[in-house]
From Swiss-Prot:
The gene is ureB. GO terms for molecular function: urease activity. Keywords: Cytoplasm, Hydrolase. Belongs to the urease beta subunit family. SUPFAM superfamilies: Urease, beta-subunit (SSF51278). GO terms for biological process: urea catabolic process. InterPro entries: Urease_beta-like (IPR002019), Urease_betasu_sf (IPR036461), Urease_subunit (IPR050069). Heterotrimer of UreA (gamma), UreB (beta) and UreC (alpha) subunits. Three heterotrimers associate to form the active enzyme. The keyword Hydrolase applies. HAMAP family: Urease_beta (MF_01954). This is Urease subunit beta. It catalyses: urea + 2 H2O + H(+) = hydrogencarbonate + 2 NH4(+). It is an enzyme of class 3 (hydrolase).
């Protein structure tokens, strides 16, 4: 076993089962690619990304941990977000929340 490795049963595994999700359309209005990681508070993502930020407050991408989604310049894509869990407090990132949601 490798430190940090997770051994799972064979078959498919549903991530974030039963958690509230939100689907948003995101457009990269900038001239450079933007990549957003799996656990980044999507509300605070790069300002070049155009989407309903108010709706995305308290959500992150609904993708596997350690992965990311890349938005190319001029690209529009639909992504699914999942509600943040735990204490529902956000610190850091762009400093737009700095406390409970």
């Amino acid at each position: 076993m490798i430190p940090g490795e997770i051994l799972t049963d064979d078959g498919e595994h549903e991530l974030n089962a039963g958690r509230p999700t939100l689907t948003v359309v995101v457009a990269n209005t900038g001239d450079r690619p933007v990549q957003v990681g799996s656990h980044y508070h999507f509300f605070e993502a790069n300002d070049a990304l155009s989407f309903d930020r108010a709706a995305a407050r308290g959500f992150r991408l609904n993708i596997a941990a350690g992965t990311a989604v890349r938005f190319e310049p001029g690209q529009t894509r639909t992504v699914e977000l999942v509600e943040l869990a735990g204490e529902r407090a956000v610190y850091g990132f762009q400093g737009k929340v700095m406390g409970p949601l």
